[in-house]
């Protein structure tokens, strides 16, 4: 059975897409069959981080009725990318029916992959909530700033209230060390559990890194760089391992692969 994991964030600029790309590549390198759906439709940029020129995108699924195999782009690590399309106005405001069509379009991959990673749009938009709720688990990325906490809480609240979804974990990005990361997580969890019936899990942390910043410019995932700091290598590996073994809880509503 395919495990599906959404990578989300309450706001942009916290490292969500970088985490989604690097952990997807890491999972692929461990032998898992992984597909990455860039669901930030119209503003998608996962293909840039992977240095992959794409001709077919999700827009071709919708407008040209192509099948999912026609828009898959395999990378050097074995990761299969489903690009969301960038600069396509029609993708910026997809309605519920179009989002449903995309979710169902992935059904043929059921027997071809082990894990589907979904890079959702930042914030608590209808698209972000719907694609997150269609997954088995959601991993939210935040940074130790009040605005990030507030926006991440708003996202989790919307996900819980609208979709009754509570399988959520947290990655703390841009922190000095694990002690600081766990302190930030504990503070955030205290806020969430005070108002919502959700038992957040800690999934890992990442430090601020010139390697990650440079990887965006060089269009090569940080996890593939020889200059990758040992702490980053370990942390990406730990987070990817968490993703591979994340608990799956049954919820109602529309799900990837008709679960």
Q: For the regions a protein language model found, what residue spans apply to each?
A:
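Hydrophobic residues in beta-strands of the RecA-like P-loop NTPase core, especially within AAA+ ATPase
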Residues: 36-37, 118, 172
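NTP-binding/hydrolysis catalytic cores, primarily Walker-type P-loop NTPases
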Residues: 217-259
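Beta-strand-loop-alpha "switch" segments that mediate conformational coupling across diverse proteins
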Residues: 196-223, 236
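P-loop/Walker-type NTP enzyme "switch/lid" segment
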Residues: 37-111, 214-218
């Amino acid at each position: 059975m395919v495990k599906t994991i959404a990578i989300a964030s309450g706001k942009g600029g916290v490292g969500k897409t970088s985490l989604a790309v690097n952990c997807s590549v890491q999972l692929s390198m461990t032998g898992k069959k992984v597909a990455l759906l860039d669901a930030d439709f119209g503003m998608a940029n996962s293909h840039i981080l992977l240095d992959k020129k794409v001709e077919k995108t999700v827009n071709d699924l919708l407008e040209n009725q192509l099948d999912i195999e026609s828009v898959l782009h395999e990378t050097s690590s074995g990761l299969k990318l489903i690009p969301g399309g960038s600069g396509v106005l029609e993708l910026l405001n997809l309605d519920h029916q179009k989002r449903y069509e995309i979710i169902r379009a992935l059904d043929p991959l059921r027997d071809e992959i082990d894990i589907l990673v979904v890079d959702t749009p930042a914030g608590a938009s209808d698209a972000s909530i719907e694609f997150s709720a269609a997954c088995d688990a959601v991993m939210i990325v935040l940074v130790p700033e009040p605005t990030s906490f507030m926006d991440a809480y708003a996202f989790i609240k919307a996900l819980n209230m609208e979709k009754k979804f509570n399988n959520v974990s947290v990655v703390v990005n841009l922190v000095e060390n694990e002690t600081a990361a766990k302190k930030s997580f504990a503070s955030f969890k205290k806020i969430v559990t005070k108002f919502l019936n959700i038992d957040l899990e800690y999934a890992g942390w990442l430090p601020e890194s010139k390697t990650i910043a440079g990887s965006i410019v060089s269009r090569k995932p940080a996890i593939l760089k020889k200059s990758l700091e040992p702490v980053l290598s370990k942390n990406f590996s730990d987070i990817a391992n968490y993703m591979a073994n994340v608990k799956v809880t049954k919820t109602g509503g529309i799900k990837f692969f008709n679960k």
